[in-house]
Amino acid sequence: FLSFLSVIILTALGRGIQLRYFPGLTEGLKGVFLALPQFCVLVGCAAAAVLLGLYDDKHSMKAWKKLIGQILIAAVTATWGGVSITLFIGIPLVSWCITVFWFVFIFNAVNFFDNMDGLAVGTATIAFIFFACAAAVNGQYFVASLAALSAGSAAGFWLYNRAPASIFMGDSGSHFLGYLLAVVS
């Protein structure tokens, strides 16, 4: 949280003050400044996924309405979030469609797995650990950090979600977990 806050403060201070008083910090934050709009899109879409799940938990949405919400969240992420599956495909529209399909697939896969105590969270924890290792080996440290933090959070939740469960994720939790898995993968 403090690092995110420092980025906001340094952005507000302006480039001249940054270069004069924080030259090393400013050089290290160049990538953060460039990725901040995409990061905000990812955070906003994650919040939208949680809200979609909360609404479904409270009002039992029809499947097609939930699917439309999932497609919209995935489309915004694929368009402005900087997340895309290329698979060596040179056609951006095909890559975009595959990315949207992947997000919707992962949303629903995690939601489907959430029918037994600890299954969805345990599976997600293991997946996050592997994604963190793969990203770290490939030098993608932001993705590795996000996956490692998600693995730790999911493992902590799993302790209370395993049989006999004392807390449950619901659709809001499974949508958030599915969104994180789709982003990290």
Describe the function of each predicted region.
Residues F1-S185:
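"…together with the soluble PPM/PP2C metallo-phosphatase catalytic core" -> "…together
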